[in-house]
C-alpha cells in the first residue's frame, strides 16, 4: 500500500511540476516577446510573481497595459503579481487573481473590467521578497545602450516687440542603465529653427 501511495505521489509531482514551471515561463516568454527587460519570476503556492521593466513604450502606463495584456494571453492558472520596475527599482505591484484571469479567458468579463477589478499598490515589499531568490534576470537591461531622439519646442512671450520667441531643437540622447537606480545619459542639442 505504501509503495502505491509513494509512486502515486511521485507521479503527480512529476506531472504537475513541469506544468507549473511552464505556466510561469509562458508569462516571461510573453513579456520578453513584447520587449520587457529585467524579468524575474517566482512561484509561491497559488501565486506567480513576475518583475519587469518597460524600456520600449514611451509611456510607463502603456507599457504596463501591454504587459497585462501579454499576461492575460498566457496559460497561467494561478494568481499573478506583476511588479513594474523603473531603473531596476520597484514602483508598482499589480495583482491579478486567478478568478479574474479565468473570467477574462472565458469571456465573462471585458478587458476594461479586468483593469477595474485588478489590484494596484505601491507596496512592493512582499512581492519583491518572493522573487529575491529567483535564479537570474532574463533580458537584463544593464549595460544596454538605448538611442533616443527627443524633439523640443520652446515658446516664450516675454518681449514687447514680438508676440513669441520660439526655438525648435532635436536632441538625440544615448541612455544606458548601469546598476540598480543608476543611469547614464549623454545628450546633444541640435537647433533646427529659432527667431
Describe each region flagged by the PLM:
Residues 1-9:
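Bacterial N-terminal signal peptides that target proteins for export
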Residues 8-19:
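Bacterial N-terminal signal peptides
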Residues 22-24:
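Boundary at the C-terminal end of the N-terminal hydrophobic targeting segment
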Residues 28-51:
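Short edge beta-strands and adjacent turn/loop segments
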Residues 47-77, 81, 85-93, 124-195:
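Transmembrane beta-barrel domains of bacterial outer-membrane proteins
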Residues 84, 89-129:
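Flexible, glycine-rich linker and terminal segments associated
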